[in-house]
Amino acid sequence: MTSSNNSPQDDHQQALSEENSAPATEVTGGTGRRPLQTVFNDGRDYPRLSSFAFRRGTLTDNQEATWEANWPRLGKELDEQVNEQYIDLDEWFGRHADTIVEIGSGTGTSTAAMAPLETDKNIVAVELYRPGLAKLVGAVSREGIENIRMIKGDGVEVLQRMFRPESLAGVRIFFPDPWPKARHHKRRIVQTGTLHLIASRLRPGGILHIATDHAEYAEWIDELVNAEPQLEYIGWPEELASGADDGRGHLGQLVDRQLLTKFEDKGLRKEHTIKEYLWTKK
């Protein structure tokens, strides 16, 4: 599940895996059922969970009614019994447009705020935590946002099972759970295997954008920036921070973050340094 400390993002999207195309097997732990994890056999590291209890949030009556009225159109859920169920993005959005996937959208505050700034893009928010998705469903319904869709499921499994290779213009991972304890580092979403999987889903020229305010996690990511040969690491060029075009032209879609996420704002108030990472698919 991909998450951020002591917040709804603790229940995000980092349920994760080992690696590759061996048959998927359902894994259960404790008294609760946890998401299926694909077993990959390519020697790379993939985020995974051993035992983890998902927070069970409840919806208000209004949220439940809004969910029932809008989820069939706006949302999908990972079917853990199906190995591959690739989404027809054109049909789902009712148009052909570049698609950006946000892994671990949390409560969707920044997702809903950014979408009107990029109406020419299809945005797919992936989140495991239903109350977080319910808040985003409410915002999309209330504000009439047309370019957001949602998937309830683990981020790695959703990428593996629901998106065709080379079908995405971008992937975003903003403020993932740093899993600070050493014994939990295997749960971090940024791993060699995840980078490989993301690269396989990006089309040539597609962008991977990661942001963190956790210093030790940034060091972890620093060690992996060149780990995936299909991705060219370009850092965070100064001209992009100022809103200029660096000549690549296609970068603006993912770097025009004019609004702070809840966790970014928290980090700034704590005087944490926010580090941004950008890669392009070769």
UniProtKB/Swiss-Prot annotation:
InterPro entries: SAM-dependent_MTases_sf, tRNA_(Gua-N-7)_MeTrfase_Trmb, tRNA_methyltr_TrmB_bact. SUPFAM superfamilies: S-adenosyl-L-methionine-dependent methyltransferases (SSF53335). Coiled coil: none annotated. It is an enzyme of class 2 (transferase). Disulfide bonds: none annotated. GO terms for molecular function: tRNA (guanine(46)-N7)-methyltransferase activity. PROSITE patterns: SAM_MT_TRMB. S-adenosyl-L-methionine binds at E102, E127, D154, D177. Its EC number is 2.1.1.33. Belongs to the class I-like SAM-binding methyltransferase superfamily. TrmB family. This is tRNA (guanine-N(7)-)-methyltransferase. It comes from Corynebacterium urealyticum (strain ATCC 43042 / DSM 7109).
